[in-house]
């Protein structure tokens, strides 16, 4: 059976094995609101069990970009799924929505059940950390579309927030304080440039780079998930706005939160913790220092904008350092970055 299909480049038996291998990882993400199991035509989630008065659903989709190239070339597939989850759930968090469920799309040149299991395990790990059910997905074997060994992954997250708690940025006011939580490194943006710098400078990815980690370890460090920290802060303090510092860095992302004319963020980068990887990229890539803030997160992955009186509540809500990196000022700029 299925020999003709296999000869055309699609091995359905390898697909069956991959599904069996991923089941135990998917099952650890399940929530009581999920109806049915893996393999249904459609995935169902019972919103009535959330006991929310006026839930607003918030969705997001994203991929991992060319960070995948490094993962594939180094045969490290077990954390790239975490990146896919983080890129989606961190985005929807900015509205105050907590993730409910996640779907993934994995397209490959050829289904290798072992590699597929590693990738999906990463997705499941990210979902479990985010208290988000991996409710469904698609694994597509497309030999004519991808080179040997190559694959792509994308994710889709849905979360919910009470309508009266939905954060739009409209409450951001002059004098508000801009607070940041540390990133885990580069996260999942700017990797076309990262890879070019590595290639142009013939950097040794296996060389020890920082705190016993190799350079490869550092550049493949998975994107940090901010769900638990954001939930703790939202429960403890009045938050006027949030920002996921993703593609485009500070310069593109922070202004997105400012929907009221006449206000802009003033960022003091001297208060941002320095990470060795960004110094390396800036030096080896001969990148203008200001441009670095238009590409990378530079050490801060998630931002909260709060009134001055809420700052200590934010600090007390999480078991980590909270960095005061700026303030909201009046004027017609998009953003002002000081201390570069």
Curated annotation (Swiss-Prot):
Subcellular location: Cytoplasm
Pathway(s) of this molecule: Purine metabolism; IMP biosynthesis via de novo pathway; 5-amino-1-(5-phospho-D-ribosyl)imidazole from N(2)-formyl-N(1)-(5-phospho-D-ribosyl)glycinamide: step 2/2
Keywords in alphabetical order: ATP-binding, Cytoplasm, Ligase, Nucleotide-binding, Purine biosynthesis
BP GO annotations: 'de novo' IMP biosynthetic process; adenine biosynthetic process
GO molecular function terms listed in the Swiss-Prot or TrEMBL record: ATP binding; phosphoribosylamine-glycine ligase activity; phosphoribosylformylglycinamidine cyclo-ligase activity
InterPro entries with a match to the protein in the record: PurM-like_C_dom, PurM-like_C_sf, PurM-like_N, PurM-like_N_sf, PurM_cligase
Catalytic activity: 2-formamido-N(1)-(5-O-phospho-beta-D-ribosyl)acetamidine + ATP = 5-amino-1-(5-phospho-beta-D-ribosyl)imidazole + ADP + phosphate + H(+)
SUPFAM superfamilies tied to this protein: PurM C-terminal domain-like, PurM N-terminal domain-like
GO-annotated cellular components: cytosol
CDD domains associated with the record: PurM (cd02196)
Known EC number: 6.3.3.1
NCBIfam families given in the database record: purM
Similarity-based family: Belongs to the AIR synthase family.
Designated name of the protein: Phosphoribosylformylglycinamidine cyclo-ligase
Gene source species: Macrococcus caseolyticus (strain JCSC5402)
């Amino acid at each position: 059976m299925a020999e003709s299909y296999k000869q055309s480049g699609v091995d359905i038996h390898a697909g069956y094995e991959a599904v069996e291998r991923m089941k135990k990882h998917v099952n650890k993400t399940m929530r009581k609101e999920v109806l049915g199991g893996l393999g249904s035509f459609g995935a169902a989630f019972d919103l009535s069990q959330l006991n929310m008065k006026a839930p607003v659903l918030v969705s997001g989709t994203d991929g991992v970009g060319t960070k995948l190239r490094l993962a594939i070339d180094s045969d490290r597939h077990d954390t790239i799924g975490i990146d896919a989850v983080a890129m989606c759930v961190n985005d929807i968090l900015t509205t105050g929505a907590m993730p409910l469920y996640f779907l993934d799309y994995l397209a490959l040149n050829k289904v290798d059940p072992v590699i597929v299991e590693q990738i999906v395990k990463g997705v499941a790990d990210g979902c479990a950390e985010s208290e988000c059910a991996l409710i469904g997905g698609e694994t597509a074997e497309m030999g004519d579309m991808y080179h040997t060994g190559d694959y792509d992954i994308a994710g889709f997250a849905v979360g919910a927030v009470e309508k009266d708690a939905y954060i739009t940025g409209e409450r951001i006011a002059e004098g508000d304080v801009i607070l940041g939580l540390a990133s885990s490194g580069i996260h999942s943006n700017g990797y076309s440039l990262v890879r070019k710098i590595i290639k142009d400078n013939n950097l040794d990815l296996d060389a020890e780079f920082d705190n016993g980690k190799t350079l490869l370890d550092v550049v493949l460090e998975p994107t940090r998930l901010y769900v638990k920290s954001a939930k703790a802060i939202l429960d403890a303090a009045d938050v006027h706005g949030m920002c996921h510092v993703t593609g485009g860095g500070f310069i593109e992302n922070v202004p997105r939160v400012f929907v009221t004319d006449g206000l802009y963020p003033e960022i003091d980068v001297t208060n941002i913790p320095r990470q060795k990887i960004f110094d390396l990229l800036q030096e080896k890539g001969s990148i203008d220092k200001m441009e670095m803030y238009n590409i990378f997160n530079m050490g801060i992955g998630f931002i909260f904008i709060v009134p001055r009186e809420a700052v200590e509540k934010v600090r007390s809500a999480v078991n980590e350092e909270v960095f005061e990196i700026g303030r909201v000022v009046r004027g017609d700029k998009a953003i002002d970055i000081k201390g570069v």
